[in-house]
């Protein structure tokens, strides 16, 4: 059974998608053993507790420096002994020590088709604002492994979503979540849990093997 922890900063809709997929049997051989947020007031913590999942807050505001926070975050992660760390809208840069310790065991969901509209400053609604400003006809979401760069790790899966002429950042954001993010992230967890993904020479390869 793959031990999964989910790191979140906001409402936790992607977290909920994984919870629901596990409950429905769409994600097999995986269990969410903990949820960590950097904000104690967000709904994601409530979602976790409602599902019987231990949920804690580790906020940079509670520590004297980023270095001390990074140590506290890594220590809390280790307490859950995860096999996989899922960043589901986690707006804090992951410490390099954690990236190295959990190499190819941290995945992130990003609301664009990487390499478009990604990197420093591209998160949340801002991604969709920039997509509309550029006038793209297709956007989407990407699940990728996390490395030392920002949105630069090996791509696991992508799903395209059409941009409508009357879209606002809010309507586009919602459709990307519904049509891409909420499908891609649980599927990636399932693929990893069941041995269908490996990283070869910096690229993700998909296989049909089962654990």
Name each model-derived stretch.
Residues 1-43:
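N-terminal Rossmann-like dinucleotide-binding module
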Residues 33, 83, 104:
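Conserved acidic residues
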Residues 41-46, 95:
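Short, glycine/polar-rich helix-capping loops at beta-to-alpha or helix-loop-helix junctions
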Residues 56-61, 117:
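Short beta->alpha connector loops at strand-helix junctions that form conserved
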Residues 64-78, 82:
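Glycine/small-residue-rich loop that forms an oxyanion/phosphate-binding "nest" at active or ligand-binding sites
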Residues 88-201:
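Donor/substrate-binding cores of folate-linked one-carbon enzymes
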Residues 199-211:
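A short, charged, Gly/Pro-tolerant segment at domain boundaries
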């Amino acid at each position: 059974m793959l031990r999964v922890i989910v790191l979140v900063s906001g409402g936790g809709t992607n977290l909920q998608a994984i919870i629901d997929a596990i409950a429905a049997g769409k994600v097999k051989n995986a269990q969410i053993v903990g949820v960590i947020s950097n904000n104690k007031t967000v709904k994601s913590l409530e979602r976790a507790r409602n599902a019987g999942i231990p949920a804690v807050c580790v906020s940079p505001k509670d520590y004297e420096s980023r270095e001390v926070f990074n140590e506290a975050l890594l220590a809390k992660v280790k307490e859950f002994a995860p096999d996989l760390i899922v960043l589901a809208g986690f707006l804090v840069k992951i410490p390099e020590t954690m990236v190295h310790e959990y190499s190819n065991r941290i995945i992130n969901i990003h609301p664009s088709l990487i390499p478009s509209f990604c990197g420093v400053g591209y998160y949340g609604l801002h991604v969709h604002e920039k997509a509309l400003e550029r006038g793209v006809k297709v956007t989407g979401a990407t699940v990728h492994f996390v490395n030392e760069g920002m949105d630069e790790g090996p791509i696991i899966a992508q799903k395209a979503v059409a941009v409508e002429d009357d879209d606002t950042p809010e309507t586009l954001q919602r459709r990307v979540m519904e049509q891409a993010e909420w499908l891609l992230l649980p599927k990636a967890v399932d693929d990893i849990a069941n041995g269908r993904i490996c990283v070869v020479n910096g690229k993700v390869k998909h296989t049909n093997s089962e654990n």
